[in-house]
Amino acid sequence: MQLHFLSIVSQKEIMRFPLLFLCLLSVQPLVAEDYPPGTFEYTPRVDLGLRPVVVDRLPERTLNLPAGFKVRFFSGEVNHARFMAFDENDVLHVGNFNTQRSGYWHKDPWRDATVLAMPDFNRDGQADRVYVAADDLQLPHSIAFYKGHMYVADHDKIYKMYDGDGDGYYEQREKLISVPGIMNRPSEHITHTLLFDEQKEKLYLHVGSGCDLCREDDPERATIMQFNTDGTERRIYASGIRNAVGLDLHPITGQLWAAGHGHDREGRSLPPEWVSIILPDTFHGWPFAYAYRSWIDFSDPVYSKEILPITAQDSALVRKMQRPTVLVDAHLGPMGLHFYTHEQFPQRYKNAAFIAFHAGTGSSFDPGYKVSVIFSNPDGTNARIADFMTGFRPDPDKGFYWAQPMGLVTDSEGYLYMSSDLVTPGIFRIEYDPQ
């Protein structure tokens, strides 16, 4: 097992206090759960011994997976595939942005975006056909099925959809919830992820910030919201969350986990991206701090103009921050977060969390563009992270990448599906065959 240790001082501090830095290197690295406020540790890494595997139905492409795993290209009949969900008949559905005319990060004024259905009734690992299950949408990022209905998160509302005649097309809808939508501001976050907690009969919804770093006028931005499943009892469940696209419930504890994005303007290595257990009424740092109470560098004139002065209330919020469960390299863009609960994969993956990293640009030390897996105790302690599927960026020293991991989901048989929204839009299926 390979452990990565992060110095708790910046490069400027190393230059100012070289003896202090040498002392830090001479002591044992802190356990990831034990580091003090104002510092942070990257989560230790595990090496799964990835091997090259040719992608079935994409013979010109190779990905790297642990021994015994293989990957198929399930379908490429999609414009920009976002998050996925299976209905009660085990038919895969995927949110499909149609941005050929409107631009990728703008709502579609023609309302050409759709939800696509991709049945695989003969179970050969390839979609039998692809058809429109719902249309007249703008940015349908996230989908969920609950008690026979399909729920779709568009940029400004959550729809509850009905398939009255059972033909697979959801011809009726009602607006369940209105949410903060697009404001056409720089660096705003425009998608929403929804998640049902069937045990507690609650609905969670991530609402990203309307900027990279600023003081929001709308208290519901940069939060995770909670509702009853009928849309009532609206409340802010947790705040200080710039953009937590990945949401899932731990299969043992039932606790909400989220994967979040850090701010943009603090260099190649800061701030780390994170995964955390999200408890009710907690604050997670934005726009003042990151990781475990590490203050943002407000010497940046853009940030200082937006945030300063820091108030006593701001400081009190930062003092409430808890250590994240997982910290990884900056700017990797964590997207889908999915706990694996099936038996098809080896036992070590049972109840582990898979996470899709959508980015890994020149601003990051990690090549990115990959799927990783988090191993931990149910309460998040003793967390370790491992690369599970890499190769979308074949040469880390070059900018070329041929797909961007987005969503993750499993079917009833335990196959893992990954969507890619750009370069090679489509759905990939990962399966385990030790032979």
PLM regions and their residue ranges:
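Surface loop/turn motifs at the tips and blade-to-blade linkers of beta-strand repeat domains
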Residues: 75-77, 132-136, 177-185, 236-240, ...
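Beta-rich catalytic cores
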Residues: 80, 111, 129, 139, ...
